[in-house]
Regions:
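Compact, glycine/acidic-enriched structural inserts
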Residues: 113-167
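Long, solvent-exposed, polar/charged low-complexity segments
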Residues: 9, 13-26, 33, 50-54, ...
Length: 210
């Protein structure tokens, strides 16, 4: 279970356009409908290229995983319950969903000026999946610890991240030897890159060497 949870051997296509960062830098300064409408043709070109990138990566992931679908998130923000009424996101966000019912978790790529990262794991697990994760950790937490603390994994993906319950999840004692892991409501691993990394021609080679 632990191996399936965190393993991701991914190879990306060579590069993305640096115009992505230029566009979002300008949008962050002019986050209004008038400016966006004037620059929508430019956005559509970038959106199309990112979709092609996502579909290409989906094919590559399917060489060693089981990916059901790729999703590029909409640029329009839901401002109904937000104090921030700016209408547009200032980043591209995309996700690759693993094939159910046999596979869980997924992958996410975030493209924003000076905030580029790849993530894998469980961002919003449903109650059944979260229950299963906790049961597996309770049964053999050391297996999971060995995996996420292995030097070759940790040097790339860093520390386990995610929201936690304050004390102990229902059904588990506060003095459970694996309580530090059981408290997690999310299981996320992340690797960050610079703007230059994501558009560099050798980006795929750097990932291969990770």
């Amino acid at each position: 279970m632990a191996q399936r949870l965190v393993t991701w051997n991914v190879r990306l296509m060579k590069a993305l356009s640096p115009n992505i960062f230029k566009f979002f830098s300008e949008l962050s300064k002019h986050n209004n409908r008038e400016w966006f409408d004037q620059h929508k043709p430019e956005f559509k070109v970038l959106e199309t290229s990112v979709k092609q990138f996502g579909e290409t990566l989906k094919d590559k992931l399917n060489q060693h995983d089981s990916i059901d679908r790729f999703k590029l998130f909409r640029i329009y923000r839901d401002v109904r319950f937000s104090k921030d009424k700016t209408p547009y996101k200032t980043h591209f966000g995309m996700a690759w969903h693993r094939t159910k019912p046999y596979y869980r978790g997924g992958y996410y790529l975030h493209l924003k000026p000076n905030d580029v990262f790849l993530a894998c794991g469980f961002w919003d697990p449903n109650p059944i999946d979260l229950k299963r994760i906790r049961e597996e950790i309770d049964l053999d937490g050391q297996e999971y610890r060995n995996l996420i603390n292995a030097a070759d994994f940790k040097n790339v993906w860093g520390e386990l991240q995610g929201d936690k319950v304050k004390t102990a999840p229902k059904g588990y004692a506060k003095d459970n030897p694996n309580i530090d892991l059981l408290r997690y409501k999310q299981h996320i691993f992340m690797v960050r890159y610079t703007n230059q990394d994501i558009v560099a021609e050798d980006f795929i080679d750097r990932l291969d060497g990770a």
